[in-house]
């Protein structure tokens, strides 16, 4: 259960920038581990006895007092050999595939298909072994603590007559599974299951080449020809729109104020500083006009606050709806009301719903979803595609994560490192590493299995 508890990267960065929050998270994880170990016999007790859940919890808690360290050691004695075998197998096959990639290119694809199949089968067996052993440990403890009656672990299986037809059928089924899996692995390794994702510059910058959400940064980044430049806007005190991400201007401008407290004229007189660059804050009119001159499409995030005017969205649509549609721009927002309003009033304008955490797949009228990459899973992308919706991954700044998200078939990748993203995608298309693809497959599908 603890393996399923994932904190998004942007929250992790926020937490560990504040040491006291980091200590709190570590303490919570340790407490969760302690509870999981302490209550290990509870699951067998709930399954194999007729004791009401509340009484089962109370009895388990009482009987396991003083047994936590012994149980933890037993769990580690199961986990460590499995982890070591998995690591050695993965490293061994990775090195073998790397050798094939560099010295036996004609056999590299066949070798990758076989290696991936072997790795999947062995890891599945190890996972089953670990799960069964963990359950047996819990069952044994439940018996010792008299939470359940003693179990007869030796099942009596009646002998069956294995005639020729049965054997042929079994062999045929195995061959079918192996053949189907091999075709799937081949399609995955050759890129047949994935399309080229859109490249999207986060806040209009690439590797700190300017101040986020400003026109000079837009001009510099547009030279690299991203598919979209993502940017943010807020409503101002006089109900206009300014290009700004933060709800407080202090970090960028030194002014301790919020966008809704200043007029647009006051906002655009402020100077923003970041990454060694200095420039003026831009109105959305100025930024949009600059993007049109550059023929650069935008992905516009509409930021909302409780202080926004009731007519904000109607005003925005009246001013920009048809213009954005003509420019082939797109929108996204964390505010569900923004998404539904845009989809209702400007249905042809693609509008995405931003989700910082993906627990279940939502039912929305959005054109697609902007999903935080930490909790992004292939099953979520597949579900979106089945519903004719797109998925953008945000924010992906590491080349390994870029490869992973691309192989998961995300429709777009939002990044602060546009140059690295374009290089990574080029390498994937023109100089593929089957060894790296095997690792990406394992991490992608293990994430799906956990979710």
Residues covered by each model-derived region:
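Selective recognition of hydrophobic, aromatic-rich stretches within alpha-helical transmembrane segments
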Residues: 1, 14-52, 108-145
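Nonpolar helix-loop interface/hinge motif
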Residues: 31-99
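Internal/C-terminal transmembrane anchor helices
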Residues: 155-189
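Membrane-interface segments at or immediately adjacent to transmembrane helices
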Residues: 186-238, 250-252, 257-261, 266, ...
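Structural preference for beta-strand elements that scaffold enzyme active sites
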Residues: 196-200, 228-230, 297-299, 328-331, ...
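Conserved, mostly hydrophobic/aromatic
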Residues: 202, 221, 232, 267, ...
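Metal-dependent phosphodiesterase/phospholipase catalytic core, i.e.
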Residues: 245-349, 385, 441-450
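C-terminal active-site rim and adjoining tail of enzyme catalytic domains
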Residues: 354-451
């Amino acid at each position: 259960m603890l393996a399923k508890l994932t904190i998004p990267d942007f929250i992790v960065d926020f937490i560990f920038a504040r040491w006291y929050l980091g200590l709190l998270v570590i303490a919570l994880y340790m407490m969760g581990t302690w509870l999981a170990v302490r209550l290990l016999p509870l699951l067998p007790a709930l399954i194999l006895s007729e004791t009401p859940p509340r009484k089962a919890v109370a009895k388990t808690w009482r009987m396991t007092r003083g047994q936590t360290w012994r149980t933890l050691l037993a769990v580690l004695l199961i986990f460590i050999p499995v982890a070591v075998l998995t690591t050695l197998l993965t490293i061994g096959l990775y090195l073998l595939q790397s050798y094939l990639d560099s010295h036996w290119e004609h056999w590299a694809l066949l070798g990758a298909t076989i290696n991936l199949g072997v790795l999947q089968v062995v890891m599945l067996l190890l996972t089953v072994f670990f799960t069964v052993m963990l359950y047996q440990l819990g069952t044994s403890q439940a018996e010792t603590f008299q939470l359940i009656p003693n179990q007869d672990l030796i099942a009596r299986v009646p002998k069956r007559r294995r005639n020729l037809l049965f054997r042929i059928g079994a062999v045929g089924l195995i061959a079918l599974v192996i053949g189907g899996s091999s075709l799937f692995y081949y399609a995955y390794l050759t890129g047949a299951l994935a399309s080229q994702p859109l490249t999207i510059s986060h806040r209009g910058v690439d590797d700190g080449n300017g101040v986020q959400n400003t026109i000079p940064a837009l001009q510099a980044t547009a030279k690299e020809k991203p598919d979209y430049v993502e940017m943010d806007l807020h409503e101002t005190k006089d109900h206009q729109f300014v290009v700004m991400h933060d709800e407080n201007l202090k970090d960028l401008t030194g002014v301790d104020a919020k966008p809704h407290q200043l007029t647009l004229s006051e906002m655009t007189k402020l100077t923003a500083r970041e990454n060694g660059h200095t420039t003026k804050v831009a109105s959305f009119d100025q930024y949009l006009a600059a993007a049109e001159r550059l023929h650069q499409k935008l992905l516009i995030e509409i930021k909302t606050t409780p202080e926004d005017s009731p007519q904000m969205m109607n005003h925005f649509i009246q001013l920009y709806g048809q213009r954005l549609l003509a420019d082939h721009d797109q929108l996204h927002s964390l505010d569900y009301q923004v998404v539904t309003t845009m989809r209702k009033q400007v249905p042809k304008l693609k509008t995405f719903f931003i989700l910082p955490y993906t627990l279940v797949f939502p039912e929305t009228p959005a054109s697609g979803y902007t999903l935080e990459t930490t909790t992004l899973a292939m099953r979520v992308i597949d579900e979106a595609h089945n519903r004719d919706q797109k998925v953008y991954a945000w924010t992906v700044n590491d080349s390994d994560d870029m490869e992973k998200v691309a192989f998961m078939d995300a429709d777009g990748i939002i990044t602060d490192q546009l140059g690295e993203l374009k290089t990574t995608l080029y390498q994937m298309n023109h100089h593929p590493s089957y060894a790296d693809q095997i690792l990406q497959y394992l991490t992608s599908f293990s994430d799906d299995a956990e979710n």
